[in-house]
């Protein structure tokens, strides 16, 4: 595809070349006169070649009016804007939007009355989220501090009460506790805070124990504070350190992070100074071995200090340590452009050697002494850290710092038994320790097969009985089967069978072979294992039996081969719906089974709650299209309850839109009206169940296109492609209206209000849709104002609805809606006047209007609060009370 795009760009360039040179037949003198202009044009062509191919296609689409309109017709641009962004919480806004920082920057710079940042909690979430140390983040914090400080020159009155410089201590404390070096550094520079002030904050607000449980972030901020001389003497990283070595020294860490962690740790303390202090306090006895280890550590630190990060390639730095040691990452020198993959020895070449080699243009004369073995470097890092902890932790805590199994696997050549003794038995190993040990040993390609056989035999013979408990056998079984090594599995099964033959059946210790194979079939990751079971253990297990349910466990990548093996002996798979809807892959399996009725038998007898959770869980996993495919082809025994469609509060409510469009594609407002009329007739007898009964809809669907090849489809007897099917579902009136709202069918909602006011405006339907708890979560300022205008124009029975909408507008801070009401020439401003005996044209009493203002104060939108206080005819005492509330929050 890339080549095709490049060809197209070259063709475009060639076309331009021909256009520029179309006067080649002119006289030579004319050519010379045009030569500067030709050169200028050719220079433009060269810059054009630097454009990414995808950008060419973007502009082709962007300039095509028809395609452009079609794409942007899916965006509700007039409905959503800054006025609909309320607060910047960490989950839904900061991490839920890829451009959240840009939105905040734009909102601040726009001097808009509607500020997204509403309170200190929003700022704390920002500090917790944006920590990257780059120019963009630094500029962002400078802008933030400038905007929210007492010296701000913004012409707009801030709706928020935040003033960074009015409580310097509190914000320093928050930035340290959120380990945000970037924000703290910019904060100190912006407000020109001296080191003594920071020390004072540390002494009062940050306990020395804060650095006791050390993470990478805490090491980073500790060293930063130390570098600017802002650490009080009471705050020492050591001996309070209690680092989680399992995380800190994990071989799954990226190499570059591991190097940084090492440097942060070593830089955080002066070993010699600490040793001298401990000697003075009599805490450290000078023993020859201690001195030897201390000298060894210093020597390793010196050696590692000579190694520069620039000597490693980007591939190496971005790889995990485990991958580097397993030789699965391409490695290359830091200067040469060629990359070579190694399988025996990982090396880097010193920059000095590279420099000399490049100057001499001779890559064959590299001094072998200048080559550094990467494995040795990694080993030095680990040994240095282990020695470091030996000298810095309290004696009573030294027992928790043990070397991990992977350290012995990669850096020490020891027997399996000896490694078990070191990393498991010595520490009275937990189930997790056993799990890690067995899986690592059995999957390690560098350990001889005979040693693995011996391990299996020792476990089955209870050689590890000291720490190996009965239920730990299942951990071992899983480790064997997850190895996906046919030789190991075969050896294990034969030994199990042999042990069972020598035992009394009633007290057999281990499960049957057939049960073991089925219990762990979800671990099979290659066809050869399936073939092995099929050829050798087919009669001893249920894996390939007729109507077996093991298809639920087989990995999707292998399911086709499993179907082939099962079908080759005339058997079918069975897929029961009950209890399996929570499996992440169940919907994919279900769709596959529906399309292959000759291979699967399916029972759709699950309850409505089963189907609800199936849809719920898969919407959360971005599988809207799979759900649609399922609904298009499934044969339900009863209408499906889809009340989940009305979910407005779930974090994935927006993902439901695709499904809602699919279901309501051919359901007109007239058909909805007919259904509601039937519901309305049922309400006359005031029966609760009937009044709140669900509405049943029928939508027309087309069976999904089969994903299998035509030949395979013919073999398994797939459903007819393109066949029209009917699908019945039920929803409540509330959910119906929420769905119409989400589909931008607000006109249809108003149509239904007009046609069936008795349905929506009766007291027992007062909780439907327009209640504050429901409309609050989904309404934009644009549509909320539409509803307000509609209720104003139809005041017969809509006063309650109108009031709820005004409360929502106030709480969300939609200032413009109230400005429009106040400036309206349609005499709607009376809505914001107090109803009295002499003024019956108003709708709301003093308490109701007071509550509207209270909501704006609670949301910290003081501009709106002051607007309403000044306009509503409160008493002088009432105005003063509301203004005092504002002052208390400022």
From Swiss-Prot:
For region Disordered, the annotated ranges are 1-39
**InterPro entries assigned:** UPF0746_actin_org (IPR051904)
Q: Where is the composition biased (Basic and acidic residues)?
A: 1-35
The UniProt entry's sequence similarity note says: Belongs to the UPF0746 family.
Name of this protein: UPF0746 protein DDB_G0280811
Q: Which organism is it from?
A: Dictyostelium discoideum (Social amoeba)
